[in-house]
Amino acid sequence: VEIAELAMDFVKKHTDIPIVLDPVLVCKESHDVEVSALREELLKFFPYATIITPNLVEAELLAQKSIQNLEDMKAVAKELYDLGAQHVVIKGGNRFSQELAVDVFYDGQDFHILESPVLSQNNVGAGCTFASSIASQLLLDQPVLEAVKEAKEFVYQAILHSDQYGVKQNYDQS
């Protein structure tokens, strides 16, 4: 909580900096009580974030709703927007399609469905890379939707060509 307070002080003082909030709520060591407390802290940041980038599980935890299909993704994106986020992209991965990685972007007015072919290899860290790439594009003054599209393509290409750089196949996270 102390770190969250320091971070909040920073974002309140620097409203001219684009903020990409990647709400990592789930890891092997997390417990329900910790997730609930972290959720409450993260919600406080929504009004200051240029965009939030939860995956499906994180979006479900933040909205406290289940996502079973694309329409649910849209409804949860709208709900997260209504909680104060300026823009929302929910990373759907391949939960609903084995062929396509489907993300939903919402800006308060329009939904945009972003798709790319599913690549199963070397995808550890893809979510963090996606959020970092969005931040980089925003610092280059890209509009938010364009930044998201560029980031999705960047991550796709990075995974697609990762074997050329010696990235180990099927990296074991344990």
Named regions from a protein language model:
Residues 1-44:
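Glycine/small-residue-rich loop that forms an oxyanion/phosphate-binding "nest" at active or ligand-binding sites
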